[in-house]
C-alpha cells in the first residue's frame, strides 16, 4: 500500500478529533485563548448542548485584520517566540495555549466566524470559515473597545460520524458548565458568565487576586458550605508552591468530582495529584468517601511538561516525588491545625432530619394546658432539681460526680480543676511557683465550663452519647468514635517518635529484588528501622529482613519489602509500611476505645471533651464519620418556632 500525503482539510479534521472531543472542549480552547489575550471578562453562550451554537466573547487585546487569517492556519500562534539563539523552547510555556491548533481544528468541523477589534484600533474586522474553507477578511461592527467575538455553529456538521458519539444535550450542557466552573476557579480575577439556551447559569464578577478573592470565587462556584468547611493551604518546598483550600475530613463526598487541581493556572486531571490528595486524607476517610479540595500548584515552567496531552489536560513533572510529598505534607499539616473542627453540614443534616420527623398536624396540642403537670413519682435514681422541673442524675447513678460537686459551687471557678482531679488525681503546686498575675484577696474571676469549645458535659444518653452545653448551643458527642480517634492519634504519636516495637524473625528472610530496587530500599534502612522494619543488604539484588513491626503480627515480609520498593520507585517514600502500620493502629484503637454502652461519670465525660479539644483530627473518627455534632441555640429555637 503506497504512502500518501493527506490533504490539509483531512489533517485538520484529524487534529480536531484530538483537540475538540465535544462542545465543552471547543469552549475550553476558546476560553484559553481569551485568557491568554488578557481578558478581564468572558461571556459564553451555548445552544443545543453546544452543538447548535457556541459564542465566546471577551475584552482581550483582540486581533488585527492581518492577524485574522493567520490565526486560522495550523500551528500559527502568538504564544511562542524564539530565544536569542533562535530556539523555540516548549518547556518555557507561560500561556494556556501554545500549539496554534484550536481555531483551525474547530473551523474544519464547524461553521466559524470571528469578529474582533485590536486594542488601540478604531476598525473592527471579521472572517468566516466553513468546513475548513477560509473566507476573506471584511469590515465588521463590534460593540466593545477591543476584544474578540467567536461564534461556532453546527459543530461536527462536517464529520457526521462524530455526532453519533455525542451525549444528550443535557449531558453536554453539564460538561460545559463544569468547564466554565474550572476556568473560573483557575482565574479569580476574570469575570465569567454562562448562558445555556437563553438561561443564565453562571454570573461571576472579577475578584481581587489573592487568597481572599480566590476563596470568594470558590464560595461562589462550590457553595457557601465549602467556604465554611475549608482550611487554607500555603506551603513551599524546593521552589514548588502549593496554595488553595481543602475541605475538612467530615466535609466529604461520595465521588472525586469535587477535587479541582490546577498547575500554573491550568486546570488538570492528573493521577499523581489525585493520588497524593487521597493519601493525605487516608487517615480520616473511609475508602468509599472522597475529600473536597481546590489546590493550586505553582512552579517553574522548566519543571513541568504541559505538552503531553492533546487537550493539555495532563502534565508531567520533572520531580513527581517532590510534588507528591509537598501535597501530602501540606495537607496533613493543615488538617492537624484544624484541631477538633468538624463539618458544619453535619449539624445542618441533623436539623433537617429533626424537622422532617417533627412536623406536627395543626391543632395537635389544642388541649394542652400550661403548668398542668402536678408532679408524680420520680424515676428511680433521679431527684427533683431546682424548681424548673429539670432533673439530673443522683450520685448513685453517676458515681464519682458527687465528689466533684461537693467541692465546687455551681458555676464557680473550680469546676475544671475538680473535674481534672476526679479524672487524674489531685495536684499540688510546688512551692515558690509564681502564677501569672499573682494572688490577691479579691475573688478569682468566675469561669464557666460552658466557655470551653466543646462545653461542659451535662448528661449521657443511651450510654453512648455525651450531651454538652456550650455558650451558644449544644454539642452531642459519640463517645466511642471520639475516644477511638484519641487513642489512634496517641499511637501515631508514639510511632512518629520511633517507639515502634519490633519482633525478630526466627530465620531472617532474604528478599530478591531488581538491583536498583534493592539499592533504593537499603538506602532507606534507617528510616525503615524507625518504623520497626530492620533490613540490610545481602548482595546485589537482595535484601535481608531481620525484624518486622510487632504490630503487624505474622506478616509477609517479602511482600512488604516489594511494596516498599514499588513506593520508593514511584513516590520516593516508603508509604506501604506506614499505611500498614497506621491501618493496624486504627484497628487496635477501635477495639481499645470506650465502647458504646459504657456508663461514664461526669468527670470522665468532661475529661474526654478536654482531650478532644487538645487533639488534632478529633472532629472525625478513623473512618471519616463525625465524632460530634454541634447544634446552635438559634437553630434549636427555630425548631420550636421561637425564631
From Swiss-Prot:
GO terms for cellular component: mismatch repair complex. SMART domains: DNA_mis_repair, MutL_C. InterPro entries: DNA_mismatch_repair_CS (IPR014762), DNA_mismatch_repair_MutL (IPR020667), DNA_mismatch_S5_2-like (IPR013507), HATPase_C_sf (IPR036890), MutL/Mlh/PMS (IPR002099), MutL/Mlh/Pms-like (IPR038973), MutL_C (IPR014790), MutL_C_dimsub (IPR042120). GO terms for biological process: mismatch repair. One of its GO terms (molecular function) is ATP-dependent DNA damage sensor activity. It comes from the Bacteria. The keyword Zinc-finger does not apply. The keyword Lyase does not apply. Keywords: DNA damage, DNA repair. Belongs to the DNA mismatch repair MutL/HexB family. This protein is involved in the repair of mismatches in DNA. It is required for dam-dependent methyl-directed DNA mismatch repair. May act as a 'molecular matchmaker', a protein that promotes the formation of a stable complex between two or more DNA-binding proteins in an ATP-dependent manner without itself being part of a final effector complex. PANTHER family: DNA MISMATCH REPAIR PROTEIN MLH, PMS, MUTL, DNA MISMATCH REPAIR PROTEIN MLH1. This is DNA mismatch repair protein MutL. It comes from Caulobacter sp. (strain K31). The gene is mutL.
